[in-house]
Amino acid sequence: MSSCNFTHATFVLIGIPGLEKAHFWVGFPLLSMYVVAMFGNCIVVFIVRTERSLHAPMYLFLCMLAAIDLALSTSTMPKILALFWFDSREISFEACLTQMFFIHALSAIESTILLAMAFDRYVAICHPLRHAAVLNNTVTAQIGIVAVVRGSLFFFPLPLLIKRLAFCHSNVLSHSYCVHQDVMKLAYADTLPNVVYGLTAILLVMGVDVMFISLSYFLIIRTVLQLPSKSERAKAFGTCVSHIGVVLAFYVPLIGLSVVHRFGNSLHPIVRVVMGDIYLLLPPVINPIIYGAKTKQIRTRVLAMFKISCDKDLQAVGGK
């Protein structure tokens, strides 16, 4: 960009630095993962909404999680695929800020829902007699609203902080989509407020959530170890396995990506970009698989849907 400007910049997305010639082929596994994520999460939302036996807090939170994963992956994947297959590298300043907001806000909302699910497990195991009173459907809906408001309020300032900056030198983003850290690095201005607020928001949302999730499981483990029989302990731990898997799938890539963004300047840019793409696609892909494999009602409904579909196909073939 030849001159400084504030709000009329057009950014250019590189994709995966060093692998530009392979973008066309890289797009196919990304599309496959996106299709799996869309299909799996839509199935979860449909089954939880239509299966009355799943209208319990844990599964309502799971439905919220699936909806967030759908929104998070859809906020980036269409543009990534357009970049990889049609060389659509340009993204307007406003579109970049909008994408940035949704990526960060939806991640914060998902973190809050994971905390709520940990609280649900804590109450169910440590205070089972109070579970129905503490976490009814009304409270569950209120927690969902709080999660949306919390994530939106904490990360709404990020686009505003970017808007105050001037961009004079490069408009090239070494990434497949827009995130605060990468856009901020292109600015020709003091970015200290952006750095401080971005780090503060992450610590106050994800940091606090991780702390309370860890505390919940510390209390859960302490309670479970006091159970008299091995079968009771195994059953109690079994109700937490799916949630632990989902928590690890979300936070491990997120923490790794945050560390690489802030302290991995010596690493090749390809590492940061690939980790970013994995972070956006891994949870939406594996969350439905984790909960589908562990939840009998979801597993049964999915198998029944496939059986009905196969029976109809066989009848159609037989009719011919």
Curated annotation (Swiss-Prot):
Induction: Up-regulated in prostate cancer. GO terms for molecular function: G protein-coupled receptor activity; nuclear steroid receptor activity; olfactory receptor activity; signaling receptor activity. GO terms for biological process: adenylate cyclase-activating G protein-coupled receptor signaling pathway; cell migration; cellular response to fatty acid; melanocyte differentiation; melanocyte proliferation; positive regulation of blood pressure; positive regulation of renin secretion into blood stream; steroid hormone receptor signaling pathway. GO terms for cellular component: early endosome membrane; intracellular organelle; plasma membrane. The chain crosses the membrane at residues 25-45, 54-74, 99-119, 139-159, 196-216, 237-257, 273-293. Keywords: Cell membrane, Disulfide bond, Endosome, G-protein coupled receptor, Glycoprotein, Membrane, Olfaction, Receptor, Sensory transduction, Transducer, Transmembrane, Transmembrane helix. Residues 46-53, 120-138, 217-236, 294-320 are cytoplasmic. This is Olfactory receptor 51E2. It comes from Homo sapiens (Human). The lineage of its organism: Eukaryota, Metazoa, Chordata, Craniata, Vertebrata.
